């Protein structure tokens, strides 16, 4: 044997698993098809949000959370309704217990810290029923100080220490194409060696094959990510209930997120479940400085902007920004569209627009307290201003008529009627001016401002978009942005990959997005956010510890 365990994928889940294996004294080889510059995978590019339950940060903000409430929110959002959801549901229960228990202390011991204001993602808005409902009842999205790189740092440090002492070996440009088996058990991997590449992180690397390889091991952990960079696979798995898959989508993940290892593991006997469950965003914008193919960025908007379909009609309640990502996506694509509009004024944008991603938040990523405090002075952040100035999806005009004209020019259509758009904005402004209002979005926004975190940093003071200040109006074309795979390799609570007969595939484990973040789909149909990095941490830790025990 070349190693005790082979880990396929040098993203967050793979690094966590490898670090746990090394701590247990196991010899590990990590294989990844990308160059060394891309170590950390998708997690590097992330905003660094983590879900905690009843955290010190929540309590300081007078947010009352509990494991029982979090699990009710999770199950209401997941909507588990299939026989295949047996293991995903158990993983969900375990994850909520982890998020309410040792998760924060475990990460804090490794040096991780969090921004003091907890964000409120996926607010739901469908009301409460006996069967539950989607959304976070309270804010739970904790921003890691350092964003995605800050989440990676402790595990990269542990892995590099193990590399230095000879416990772990990192082999980049190694693409696994098969799991090696003997007498029904997996005994390692085989694959192709790719040509060296010095492209920067995230840039598409060459797929030129220069050789082949084989690595023998007692166990293999598949931590290779999902399918978000492979639009062909996304369309193949697109559920009919969402309408036809869009002909045009943009990518929220690099090209290497291709889903290839799911097929490799299936061919060896592993079972993929819930492949039609995915988590794509309807608020994607084209990056003015793209790194990968069709590079898109997600807008993290507060709830005040009007959300319109391509014909200028408002999305129905509660499909407001930040309330129900899947509901909004399904409404848009179900009507045959592949884009929508956010309409607001510049004052609202300055407070309510943030951008997802480590590179779009250099103050938080760089741990620059002075820059973070500078956000309170008002005005858009530097990255948001860059999109206002250079973003191909932004239309900024002084009047409604000119805004409508610009929207039509951008799309090459005449779908937006200026008079109808003016009436819509005026009707919204009347509701805001009343001080109370009956419009569901105005009411929901006022309710959200009761939370001090939103009132201080996230939601602008209610005001008319068409007022005497002369503030310009903004329309943003939002594309469908591919991102996460919610289904994946079915695993038991020890992260062992299961066969179609429900028995473990000997010697194979899976973690992270490749395993649907646990069990083959821990989120069900919908996520609460802050749970993808967390799912990689949780499942990677379990896989590493379980494999270490199995090869002892």
Protein language model regions, located:
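Glycine-rich loop(s) and the adjacent beta-strand/alpha-helix scaffold that form part
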Residues: 196-288, 529, 533-542
């Amino acid at each position: 044997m070349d190693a005790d365990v082979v880990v396929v994928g040098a993203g967050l889940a793979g690094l966590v698993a490898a670090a746990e294996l090394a701590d247990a004294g196991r010899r590990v080889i990590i294989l990844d098809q990308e160059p060394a510059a891309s170590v950390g995978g998708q997690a590097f590019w992330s905003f660094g949000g983590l879900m905690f339950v009843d955290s010190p940060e929540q309590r300081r903000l007078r947010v009352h959370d509990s494991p029982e409430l979090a699990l009710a929110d999770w199950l209401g959002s997941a909507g588990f309704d299939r026989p295949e959801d047996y293991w995903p549901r158990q993983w969900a229960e375990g994850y909520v217990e982890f998020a309410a228990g040792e998760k924060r202390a475990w990460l804090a011991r490794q040096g991780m810290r969090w921004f003091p204001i907890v964000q409120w993602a996926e607010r739901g808005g469908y009301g409460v029923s006996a069967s539950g409902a989607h959304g976070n009842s309270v804010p739970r999205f904790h921003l890691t100080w350092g964003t995605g790189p800050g989440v990676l740092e402790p595990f990269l440090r542990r892995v590099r220490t193990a590399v230095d002492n000879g416990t772990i070996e990192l082999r980049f440009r190694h693409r696994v194409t098969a799991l090696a088996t003997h007498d029904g058990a997996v005994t390692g991997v085989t694959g192709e060696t790719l040509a060296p590449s010095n492209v920067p992180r995230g840039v598409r690397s060459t797929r030129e094959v220069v050789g082949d390889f084989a690595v023998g091991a007692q166990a293999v952990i598949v931590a290779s990510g999902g399918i978000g960079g492979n639009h062909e696979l996304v369309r193949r798995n697109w559920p009919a209930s969402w309408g036809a898959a869009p002909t045009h989508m943009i990518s929220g993940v690099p090209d290497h997120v291709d889903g290839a290892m799911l097929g490799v593991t299936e061919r060896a006997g592993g079972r993929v479940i819930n492949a039609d469950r995915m988590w794509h965003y309807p608020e994607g914008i084209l990056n003015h400085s793209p790194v990968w193919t069709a590079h898109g960025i997600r807008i993290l908007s507060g709830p005040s902007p009007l959300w319109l379909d391509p014909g200028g009609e408002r999305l129905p309640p509660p499909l407001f920004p930040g309330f129900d990502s899947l509901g909004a996506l399904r409404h848009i694509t179900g009507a045959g569209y592949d884009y929508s509009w956010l309409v607001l004024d510049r004052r609202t944008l300055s407070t309510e627009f943030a951008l997802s991603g480590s590179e779009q938040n250099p103050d938080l990523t760089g741990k620059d307290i002075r820059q973070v405090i500078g956000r309170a002075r008002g005005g858009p952040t530097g990255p948001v201003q860059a999109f206002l100035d250079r973003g191909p999806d932004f239309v900024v005009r002084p009047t409604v008529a000119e805004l409508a004209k610009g929207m039509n020019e951008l799309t090459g259509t005449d779908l937006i009627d200026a008079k109808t758009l003016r009436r819509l904005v005026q009707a919204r402004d009347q509701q805001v001016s009343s001080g109370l209002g009956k419009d569901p979005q105005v009411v929901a926004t006022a309710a959200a401002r009761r939370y001090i975190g939103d009132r201080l940093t996230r939601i602008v003071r209610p005001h008319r978009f068409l007022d005497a200040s002369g503030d310009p109006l903004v329309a943003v074309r939002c594309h469908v942005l591919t991102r996460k795979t919610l289904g994946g390799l079915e695993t038991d609570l020890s992260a062992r990959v299961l066969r179609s007969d429900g028995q473990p595939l000997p010697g194979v484990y899976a973690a992270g997005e490749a395993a649907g973040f646990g069990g083959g789909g821990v989120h069900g149909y919908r996520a609460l956010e802050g749970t993808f990095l967390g799912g990689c941490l949780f499942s990677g830790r379990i896989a590493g510890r379980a494999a270490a025990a199995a090869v002892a």
